[in-house]
């Protein structure tokens, strides 16, 4: 996640300069990566945040880099990968609608871009011996403050199109509004799949409303791992709860995480990775972030997960201030 407040036409050069520094640390071949422009970090002045997943031990002996023929490429030479298969896990890096030179494809056509991206995701999975049915987690980063000519916002349209590629029960889905890497891009999607295990679709009727359609699970359990979809403060009629109150929404969000985990016989103490997406109107979101941390401390006093907090431009419905998803291990 990185911050760049300049013009879209200058964003690519900014990313390339930033990436030259990152290349000092990446191996070759490098990881599958997702890079999106966010509105900010928890504190003013912070410009970049990087998180990662690493596997070691015997799994390193079974690593397979996935670089399908026909995939898009970046605007500069980088050792990044489209995907990795490590044991029974497939990590799909952020996919965009671009060509071999990193030029945006399908500019002005959200449906084309969305379908291109799912085609790229499918290619990575296919080359890794997996399919869309194996996806447990899906992250949709869409162009904020954008609507189709019909008036439908981008998030809703993308999720509608996503129905073409999944059967029920679908993966755990999290969506939020950002800016993108190259001018003309409308979205970026990454995914994780686990092959050879029957997943447990987690659905709780006690959560209230949600922006994800019924196709998608509240969470997905596979073996000893549980992936919880993005949770927000929506009532059963999909109205915003605790309007204008980041603390109040965070309390609701964390209660929802706990309910989904309980459905898989887990507790908040089992969370190993927590992602928090924050919306705020001020210069920064320090006050909102501190309120969210207070809500977390009250909700899960004995839990100490790795946490990534990011300020995004928007969440799937106006008025939502907090979204959280997580990974838990038994």
Which residue ranges define each predicted feature?
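N-terminal presequence-like segments and the immediate start of the first folded domain
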Residues: 3-136, 142-255, 259-272, 278-330
């Amino acid at each position: 996640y990185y911050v760049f407040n300049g013009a879209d036409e200058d964003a690519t050069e900014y990313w390339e300069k930033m990436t030259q520094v990152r290349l000092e640390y990446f191996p070759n071949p490098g990881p599958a990566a997702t890079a999106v422009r966010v509105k900010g970090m928890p504190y003013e002045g912070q410009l970049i945040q990087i998180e990662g997943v690493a596997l070691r031990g015997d799994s390193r002996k079974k690593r397979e880099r996935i670089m399908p023929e026909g995939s898009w490429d970046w605007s500069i030479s980088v050792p990044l990968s489209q995907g990795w298969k490590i044991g029974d896990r497939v990590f799909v890096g952020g996919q965009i609608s671009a060509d071999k030179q990193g030029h945006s494809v399908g500019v002005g056509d959200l449906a084309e871009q969305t379908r291109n991206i799912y085609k790229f995701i499918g290619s990575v999975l296919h080359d890794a011996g997996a399919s869309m049915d194996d996806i447990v987690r899906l992250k949709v980063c869409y162009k904020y403050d954008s609507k189709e000519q019909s008036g439908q916002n981008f998030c809703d349209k993308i999720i509608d199109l996503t129905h073409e590629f999944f059967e029920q029960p679908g993966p755990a889905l999290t969506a939020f509004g950002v800016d993108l890497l190259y001018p003309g891009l409308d979205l970026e999607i990454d995914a994780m799949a686990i092959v050879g295990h029957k997943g447990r679709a987690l659905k709780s009727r006690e959560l209230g409303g949600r922006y994800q359609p019924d196709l998608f699970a509240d969470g997905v359990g596979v073996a000893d791992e549980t992936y919880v979809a993005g949770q927000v403060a929506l009532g059963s009629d999909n109205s915003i709860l605790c309007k204008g109150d980041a603390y109040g929404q965070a309390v609701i969000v964390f209660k929802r995480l706990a309910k989904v985990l309980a459905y898989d016989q887990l507790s908040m103490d089992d969370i190993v990775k927590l992602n928090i997406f924050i919306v705020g109107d001020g210069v920064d979101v320090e006050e909102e972030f501190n309120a969210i941390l207070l809500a977390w401390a009250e909700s899960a006093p004995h839990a100490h997960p790795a946490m990534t907090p990011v300020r995004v431009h928007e969440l799937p419905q106006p008025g939502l201030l907090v979204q959280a998803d997580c990974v838990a291990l038994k």
